[in-house]
C-alpha cells in the first residue's frame, strides 16, 4: 500500500510567504487529511542506483505560529514511496528545471505527479498561448531585431517579456524604440515575446484558476500606482471579481485543452478580456489569496479532484 506521503519539490520554505503561498496552503490542507509532507529542493533530486531519490525533510505546517513550518525529520526519500508529488518550484524554466522533469518522468507511472513532468516540459507557458492567439492582443515571438522594430512601429507601445520568465521579472514597456536595450534583451533571452500594450491594465488583470479541466475561481490584481505589473510579488492589490461571458468562453476552451495535455492545475491571465499570453502551468499561485477574499478553499477542491 502506498504511504500517505505528499512530496513537494519547491523553493526553500524559509523563503516562502505563508500569507500568500499556494504550496504551503496545499500542504496544510492535505496535512489535515493525515498525509505526511516531505519537502525538498530541486537541487536535491537525484537518480541513485536507478532509484529516484530526494534529500529533504518531513515538515508540519502551522499557520498560527511565527515560524509557519516545523522540521520533523531530515531524510533521503525514494520518491516512489510517496502518493503524490507536487512540482512547485518557481521558474526560470531553464535546463536545471527541465532536468528535474526528465528525472521525475522515470516514476510518473508509479506516483501521481502534479503537474505531469512531460507536459510541463512540452508546454512553454507563453509559447503555448500562441495556440489561442486570436484571443490575444497583437503579439509576436521572435529574436529578430527588424521584426521587433516593425512591430513597434505598428503598435506604438509594446511590452517585452522573456519567454521563460516569471513573476513580472525583466519585463519592459517600450514607448520609444530603444535599439541597444532590445539587442541586450535578445542577447540575454533569445526569443522574446512582444505584445501590444493594453492601457486598461491600470484597472487590473484577472487570474483564472483551472483544476482538472474546470474553472474554479478568479481574482483581479491591480498594479500599484505608477506600475504596469499586476503580479502580487510586484505589489499589486488583489480583489474579488467575476469573469465576463467572453473570458469564461476562452477559459473553458483553454481548460479543455490543458486537460487533454495532462495539465491538472493552471492559471490563465486576462487583461481587458484578452488573453495576455501567460498560462501558468509550472507553479500556479493565488489560491491562498482567493481563499482570504472569498472564503472558498480551492486547496480542498484540488485534493478532492485528485481523490486524495
Would you name each region that the model predicts?
Residues 10, 15-19, 242-308:
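ATP-dependent carboxylate activation and anion-phosphoryl transfer catalytic cores
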Residues 117-121, 221-224, 271-275:
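Short glycine-enriched loops at secondary-structure junctions
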Residues 8, 86-87, 195:
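Redox-cofactor binding/interface segments in oxidoreductases and associated redox assembly factors
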Residues 12, 89-92, 163-165, 284:
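Short glycine-rich anion-binding loops that position phosphate/pyrophosphate groups of nucleotides
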Residues 145-146, 153-157, 164-250, 254, ...:
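Phosphate-binding site of ATP-dependent enzymes
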Residues 14-141:
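Conserved N-proximal alpha/beta basic substrate-recognition cap immediately N-terminal to
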Residues 2-7:
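Extreme N-terminal starter segment of soluble prokaryotic enzymes
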Residues 34, 46, 175, 210-215, ...:
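Short acidic-glycine loop/turn motifs at beta-strand connectors
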Amino acid at each position: 500500500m502506498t504511504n500517505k506521503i505528499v512530496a513537494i519539490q519547491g523553493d526553500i520554505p524559509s523563503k516562502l510567504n505563508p500569507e500568500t503561498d499556494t504550496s504551503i496552503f496545499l500542504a496544510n490542507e492535505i496535512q489535515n487529511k493525515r498525509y505526511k509532507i516531505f519537502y525538498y529542493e530541486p537541487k536535491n533530486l537525484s537518480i541513485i542506483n536507478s532509484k529516484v531519490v530526494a534529500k529533504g525533510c518531513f515538515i508540519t505546517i502551522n499557520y498560527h505560529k511565527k515560524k509557519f513550518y516545523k522540521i520533523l525529520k531530515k531524510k533521503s526519500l525514494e520518491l516512489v514511496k510517496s502518493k503524490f508529488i507536487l512540482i512547485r518550484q518557481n521558474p526560470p524554466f531553464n535546463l536545471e528545471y527541465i532536468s528535474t522533469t526528465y528525472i521525475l518522468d522515470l516514476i510518473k507511472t508509479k506516483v501521481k505527479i502534479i503537474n505531469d513532468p512531460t507536459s510541463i516540459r512540452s508546454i512553454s507557458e507563453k509559447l503555448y498561448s500562441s495556440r489561442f492567439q486570436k484571443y490575444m492582443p497583437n503579439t509576436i515571438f521572435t529574436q529578430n531585431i527588424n521584426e521587433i522594430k516593425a512591430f513597434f512601429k505598428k503598435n506604438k507601445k509594446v511590452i517585452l517579456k522573456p519567454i521563460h520568465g516569471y513573476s513580472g521579472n525583466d519585463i519592459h514597456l517600450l514607448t520609444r524604440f530603444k535599439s541597444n536595450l532590445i539587442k541586450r534583451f535578445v542577447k540575454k533571452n533569445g526569443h522574446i515575446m512582444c505584445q501590444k500594450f493594453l492601457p486598461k491594465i491600470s484597472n487590473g488583470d484577472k487570474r483564472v484558476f483551472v483544476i482538472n479541466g474546470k474553472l474554479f475561481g478568479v481574482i483581479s490584481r491591480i498594479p500599484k500606482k505608477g506600475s504596469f505589473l499586476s503580479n502580487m510579488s510586484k505589489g499589486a492589490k488583489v480583489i474579488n471579481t467575476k469573469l465576463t461571458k467572453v473570458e469564461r468562453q476562452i477559459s473553458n476552451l483553454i481548460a479543455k485543452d490543458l486537460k487533454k495535455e495532462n495539465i491538472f492545475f493552471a492559471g490563465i491571465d486576462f487583461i481587458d478580456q484578452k488573453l495576455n499570453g501567460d498560462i501558468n502551468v509550472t507553479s500556479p499561485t493565488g489560491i491562498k489569496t482567493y481563499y482570504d477574499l472569498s472564503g472558498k478553499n480551492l486547496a480542498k477542491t484540488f485534493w478532492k479532484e485528485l481523490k486524495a
